[in-house]
């Protein structure tokens, strides 16, 4: 259900007195000046917005290939909070971020001690989008959070125009390469569903995606034999 509201965030200016009768939701004072960011994807968005200096700490440093973030962690200007599945709570308490940005895990049952720190937890559910442009539009939410609204709107407008132009280029292509993707992990081979962002991306790029007719919006676990 793409119309269902999963969570509400109430953004109030840092210098603004809290108004009476705020809607129910997680209160976030903006602009966020010091965030703990779990995902390399969201670090990339903040890099595009020129807001790396707003990242006070990260998780899973080994997956973040952004030189400025690597350098800031090495010099101690940015906190490495360790593994996103089991972050270093003491480090997080010490630098006390304005907000914690993470990707929600399905049926996770919550985030343990993180939820008890009194710090706004922002669940970035962009991975649940079913189109590449839908996912990229999350940059506008980040713009609101970090005081970069104008830059975010401009960036999304440019990305959208470029993407649609590229989609038009492949509409008349008759020869479409067949595509499968991902790798076997454990006993299953997880492939993007036909209605997933990645599945749509392959199709928009002019590929004949093997699971294009599949109705799933997430990953599908298949056996090695099924894939081959």
Stretches found by the model and what they are:
Residues 27, 84, 106, 183, ...:
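Short, glycine/acidic-rich beta->alpha junctions
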Residues 28, 77, 94, 98-189, ...:
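Extracytoplasmic substrate-binding proteins
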Residues 45, 91, 113, 201, ...:
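Hydrophobic/aromatic ligand-binding patch that stacks against planar heteroaromatic rings
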Residues 220-228:
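Ligand-binding pocket segment of bilobal, Venus flytrap-like solute-binding proteins
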């Amino acid at each position: 259900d793409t119309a269902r509201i999963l969570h509400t965030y109430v953004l109030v200016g840092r210098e603004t007195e809290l108004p009476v009768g705020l809607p129910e939701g997680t209160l976030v004072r903006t602009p966020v000046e010091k965030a703990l960011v779990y995902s390399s994807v969201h670090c990339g968005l903040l890099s595009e917005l020129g807001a790396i200096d707003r990242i006070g700490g990260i998780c899973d440093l080994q997956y973040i290939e952004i030189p400025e973030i690597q350098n800031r962690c090495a010099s101690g200007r940015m906190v490495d909070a360790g593994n996103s599945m089991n972050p270093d709570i003491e480090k997080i308490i010490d630098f006390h971020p304005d907000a914690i940005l993470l990707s929600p895990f399905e049926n996770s049952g919550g985030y343990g001690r993180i939820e008890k720190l009194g710090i706004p937890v922002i669940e970035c559910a962009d991975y649940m989008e079913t189109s590449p442009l839908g996912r990229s539009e999350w940059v506008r939410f980040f713009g609101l959070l970090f005081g970069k609204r104008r830059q975010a709107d401009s960036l999304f407008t440019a990305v959208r125009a470029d993407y649609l132009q590229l989609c038009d280029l492949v509409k008349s292509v008759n020869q479409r390469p067949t595509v499968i993707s991902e790798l076997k992990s454990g006993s299953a081979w997880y492939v993007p569903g036909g209605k997933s962002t990645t599945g749509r991306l392959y199709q928009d790029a002019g590929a004949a995606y093997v699971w294009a007719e599949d109705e799933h919006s997430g990953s599908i676990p298949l056996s090695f034999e099924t894939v081959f």
